[in-house]
């Protein structure tokens, strides 16, 4: 049986190790310009891609393997690659964020990323970490258990990688450059995608047969590795007629959680088991945006119901089965914060012997506001309207700016921080106020943000850190997916309203089995409390994974000092490290 109204065009992209027993996984990424058809517009557009594909190749390894990726930049842009969620213990130079751990790879140059995936299993991903290039430069990084091990859940019949993305009909890098120059936010994406394809909800000839397809067999169980690679959008994810059991988030195992809807913010991953137990036929897999912002924005034009689709097709149905049109799931409303909060707060960690547990004592406490504010045009914004304020993002009223002469990690290693960054990122906001009051929306003098600067928070090696991430209503309330490089953290509490560091007492904390993540969606008009141990020397960015916010300063960097032994000391840079 087949869904006769469409042509099967989807195939999972995968890279595998060169030999069955290899402990080194080695690949070459050729970064170059690729011409692809526009969506609901005639003609093609030029984008940057890896190995001629969007999404790029899937990298597969086992826990304990070493990954070696040779990146050759034949594009017209500077590029770096970030291995999202990889700890990079002993290899901080391979983390990838431009001007934090390395200078970019210039056009015509190359750089080799070498790192081990030790103590990690599950679904991670890789993406460009310079400008909006990650709109098309991204792919999956799957880390399976060692051969002697196995999953802490029933072995699935097959695994399916599901990469969620956004698509612009113009060059995303050029759009970001124009946005910075003018001080006007870049336009919304022209479409959402599943494995690079828009699906059948965009009713125009240009999308005919551009839909991903996942074939399943009845009564088999599948592991869906779901990755939100979108630049700016959180998604609701459903498959009509099917339910899920979530077993991992951000490559950390969870207690099994049954649900019919998955909520996934930019940067996050979810592993979910799906039983193919519906009547044989064709079913829509669908994503729709979770638009958390208050005031609630209008839906972007051209989004045809704000939903993109793929097909789940039963391949072992009888010939008499009605192929018909696929069933479409009922999606939550775009501003359904209740459903989002229900999902996020229902996940807990699966406790396993020998694995990390939440720290019970705290050395460093921080209350950090995350949100938007206003400032004046910067000198580099050559087309900015200097008679009106521009939007900047900030943490504790500090809008982050990347250095432009040397990477922060090089400055740390060579002890030349002066003129590159300062060690005065504040532990508290400059003024305490009613952070989430709707009365602040868009008209408070507290929204004034100073000029962007490069400030870090220095942490002693092995210090335990507790951060309260507090959303603010200045300019607008919105859920911010905050991603920490170099570490996982435990989400010990989250809620709505204000948390001044005392409001959520220890009695409200989950100090038994809190979910472990590398990216937390701070609730709209609320807060999240995270804990981690600073046991990884280096420069580690923490930033909003909404790229339109990161680009205007919603970021900071932790400078983690070296420990007492050679194995806990910042290593020297590799000989081929790119230079600015």
UniProtKB/Swiss-Prot annotation:
Domain Plastocyanin-like: 30-148, 158-317, 424-564
InterPro entries in alphabetical order: Cu-oxidase-like_N, Cu-oxidase_2nd, Cu-oxidase_C, Cu-oxidase_fam, Cu_oxidase_CS, Cu_oxidase_Cu_BS, Cupredoxin, CuRO_1_LCC
A Pfam entry, by short name: Cu-oxidase_2
Gene name, Swiss-Prot/TrEMBL: LAC6
Residues bound to Cu cation 2: 84, 127, 545
Binding site for Cu cation 1: 82, 483
CDD domains for this protein: CuRO_1_LCC_plant, CuRO_2_LCC_plant
Protein role: Lignin degradation and detoxification of lignin-derived products.
Record-given protein name: Laccase-6
GO molecular function list: copper ion binding; hydroquinone:oxygen oxidoreductase activity; oxidoreductase activity
Entry keywords, A to Z: Apoplast, Copper, Glycoprotein, Lignin degradation, Metal-binding, Oxidoreductase, Repeat, Secreted, Signal
Sites carrying sugar chains: 44, 78, 306, 335, 385, 397, 462
Signal sequence residues: 1-22
The keyword rRNA-binding belongs to this UniProt entry's keyword annotation: no
CC per GO annotation: apoplast
């Amino acid at each position: 049986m087949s869904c006769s109204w469409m042509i099967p065009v989807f195939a999972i992209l995968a890279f595998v190790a060169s030999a069955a027993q290899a402990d080194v996984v080695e690949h070459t990424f050729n970064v170059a310009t690729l011409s692809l058809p526009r969506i609901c517009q005639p003609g093609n557009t030029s984008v940057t891609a890896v190995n001629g594909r969007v999404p790029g190749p899937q990298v597969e390894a086992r826990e304990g393997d070493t990954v070696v990726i040779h990146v050759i930049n034949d594009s017209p842009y500077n590029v770096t690659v970030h291995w999202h969620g990889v700890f990079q213990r002993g290899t901080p130079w391979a983390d990838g964020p431009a001007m934090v751990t390395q200078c970019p790879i210039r056009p015509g140059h190359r750089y080799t990323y070498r790192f081990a995936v030790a103590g990690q299993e599950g679904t991670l991903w890789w993406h460009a970490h310079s400008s909006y290039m990650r709109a098309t430069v991204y792919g999956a990084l799957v880390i399976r258990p060692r051969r002697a091990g196995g999953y802490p859940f029933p072995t699935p019949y097959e695994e399916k990688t599901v990469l969620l993305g956004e698509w612009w009909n113009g060059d995303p890098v050029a759009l970001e450059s124009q946005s910075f120059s003018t001080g006007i936010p870049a336009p919304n994406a022209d479409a959402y995608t599943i494995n690079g394809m828009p699906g059948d909800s965009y009713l125009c000839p240009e999308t005919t047969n551009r839909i991903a397809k996942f074939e399943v067999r009845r009564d088999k169980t599948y592991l869906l590795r779901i990755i939100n690679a979108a630049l700016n959008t959180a998604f609701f994810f459903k498959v009509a007629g099917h339910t899920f059991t979530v077993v991992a988030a951000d490559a950390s195992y969870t207690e099994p959680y049954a649900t019919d809807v998955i909520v996934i913010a930019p940067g996050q991953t979810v592993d979910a088991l799906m039983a193919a137990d519906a009547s044989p036929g064709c079913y829509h897999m669908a994503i729709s945006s979770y638009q958390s912002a208050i005031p609630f924005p209008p839906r972007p034009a051209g989004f045809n119901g704000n939903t993109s689709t793929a097909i789940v097709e039963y391949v072992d149905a009888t010939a008499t089965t009605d192929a018909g049109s696929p069933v479409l799931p009922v999606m939550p409303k775009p501003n359904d914060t209740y459903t989002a909060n229900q999902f996020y707060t229902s996940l807990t960690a699966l406790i396993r012997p020998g694995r990390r547990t939440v720290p019970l004592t705290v050395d460093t406490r921080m209350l950090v506001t995350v949100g938007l504010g206003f400032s004046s045009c910067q000198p580099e914004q050559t087309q900015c309207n200097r008679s009106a304020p521009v939007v900047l993002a900030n943490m504790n009223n500090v809008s982050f700016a990347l250095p432009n002469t040397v990477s922060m990690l090089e400055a740390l290693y060579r002890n030349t921080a002066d003129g590159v960054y300062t060690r005065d990122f504040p532990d508290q906001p400059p003024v305490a106020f009613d952070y989430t009051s709707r009365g602040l929306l868009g008209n408070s003098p507290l929204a004034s943000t100073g000029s962007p600067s490069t400030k870090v928070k220095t942490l002693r090696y092995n210090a335990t850190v507790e951060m309260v991430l507090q959303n603010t209503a200045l300019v607008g309330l919105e859920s911010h997916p905050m991603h920490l490089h170099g570490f996982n953290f435990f989400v010990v509490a989250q809620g709505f309203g204000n948390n001044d560091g005392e409001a959520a007492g220890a009695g409200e904390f989950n100090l038994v089995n809190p979910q472990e993540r590398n990216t937390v969606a701070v609730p709209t008009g609320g807060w999240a409390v995270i804990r981690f141990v600073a046991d990884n020397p280096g420069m580690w960015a923490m930033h909003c994974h909404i790229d339109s916010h990161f680009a205007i300063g919603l970021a900071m960097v932790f400078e983690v000092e070296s420990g007492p032994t050679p194995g806990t000391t910042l290593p020297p840079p590799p000989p081929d490290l790119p230079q600015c």
